[in-house]
Amino acid sequence: MKTLKTIALFAVLVCPVSLAKAQNNINGITTAYFGLKNALATGSGAAAENSAKALMGALSAPEKLNADQQKIFDTYIDKLKFDTRHISEVSDIEHQREHFESLSKNLYEVLKGLKMNTATVYMDYCPMKKAYWLSETSAIKNPYYSDKSMATCGKTTATLAAVK
């Protein structure tokens, strides 16, 4: 009986720490992704290249995922790394944006499935490009068109609420 109480107390104390570590990892991934999105929105291929390198460094499996979460992460991690690596190796912004499109779709599926984002994430859509991206704010900053006339082209189509 004493052993069960000890195990229960350990689980109560350790589980929140494990969740916090996993959420910190997800926050690192989303923060790096948003840096990449913002670099593309400014039209800087060089900045996007550097931001993709930061994202590549952040792309690692969060600790303590349950079996369903691990399956989701495993389904998408190679795709996320492929697009991120490609963006980090080229400076042509149009080519970067092509890979950013699939990167965004795949990261959305990961975040939606893991339910570990501690900040609200917005999924935005550009009708001109027919492409989606994720944003940290509800304000539209279009990463597919950086010229002033198209910088705010788009609309929010989904919201992933913050998980506390």
Regions found by a protein language model. Give the residues of each.
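Bacterial Sec-dependent N-terminal signal peptides
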Residues: M1-N25
